[in-house]
Amino acid sequence: MHQEESFEVVDPNGKVIGTARRAELHSNPSLIHRVVHVLVFNLQDLLLLQRRSHNKDTAPGKWDTSVGGHVDIGEDIRSAALRELREELGIEGCSVNFLYDYLFSNRQETELVSTFTCVHSGPFRFNREEIAAVRFWSIDEINVQLDSGKISDHFVEEFRRYGKFRCRR
């Protein structure tokens, strides 16, 4: 990722109110920006997680959502989800299903996250400078690891929200 990329700044409802550089968005929690997450399940209902490269500026070496990335300027969230699937895991032609939106905020940033799912069992092609490894996990395996420090804070929040969503269905 290039530090000078710019992305849209949005209000809590997703209405575009401006643009800002990536570095600004990742250092000012008052600037909300859009990201997409795609939870990739296989046919056995196991969830794919990626282990972030140790070179990443956020959550290096931690297990994280299957796919996650910024929404480009002028891009809709479904297109962003499909692009990120292709860029991060080499997945093309996978149908994505929208689940929910939520705000994620910490000391560095605030994201308006749009979460999708898709079913794909592999193979996966990924850039080893970005992603150290991928593997499928059972829901129980993830639950055991949530407080271990091995999973990114972003994904802990995502997984807890997904669990509540899944219980309501």
Where on the chain are the PLM-derived regions?
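Acidic, metal-coordinating catalytic segment for phosphate/diphosphate chemistry
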Residues: 2-37, 41-43
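A residue-level structural signature of the nucleotidyltransferase/glycosyltransferase Rossmann-like core
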Residues: 7, 46-47, 134-135
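Nudix hydrolase/Nudix homology domain
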Residues: 24, 61, 73, 100-102, ...
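A glycine-rich, hydrophobic loop/mini-helix early in the fold
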Residues: 35-67
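A structural signal for short, well-ordered beta-strand segments
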Residues: 38, 67, 98, 114-116
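The catalytic Nudix box helix
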Residues: 48-49, 66-98
